[in-house]
Amino acid sequence: TNSQLPISHSQLVENLIERVGLTAEANKRVGQLSKGYRQRVGLAQAMIGDPELLILDEPTTGLDPNQLEDIRTLIREMGKDRTVILSTHILQEVKQMCSRVIIIDHGEIKVDKPICEIENLEETFKQATKNE
């Protein structure tokens, strides 16, 4: 960490590095990190101000299966103490990480309900986004 930062900021950064699983990579430049670790850096940056709301756009795109599960777990963990809005076209991500589904088609909300009320997400998505 940067020794010029006040101790509270230094501790915050260290806590975030640990929380997102970057402790072993902390002294590397971002460009030297894998895509999965770069995603973690982005999540840590988003968390720096301890926001009540976290908006993530396609946070798992391009990750290998191990990285994918790690990021999913991290996002679920972050969602325990804040609202997380996840934008994705990958329905498996919705099933794995979301408690509520909002499907927007051409700027219009077509579906807005808890995921537990949706029997078949794929079919719901098809019906909500079909062109009439």
Q: Which residues fall in each region the model found?
A:
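Conserved ABC ATPase signature
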Residues: 29-33
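Conserved ABC ATPase "signature" region
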Residues: 8-25
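Hydrophobic anchor residue at the start of the ABC signature
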Residues: 43
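A short, proline-enriched helix->beta-strand linker immediately N-terminal to the Walker B motif
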Residues: 48-52
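A short, surface-exposed alpha-helical micro-motif characterized by mixed small hydrophobic
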Residues: 94-96
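Catalytic Walker B motif of ABC-type/P-loop ATPase nucleotide-binding domains
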Residues: 54-58
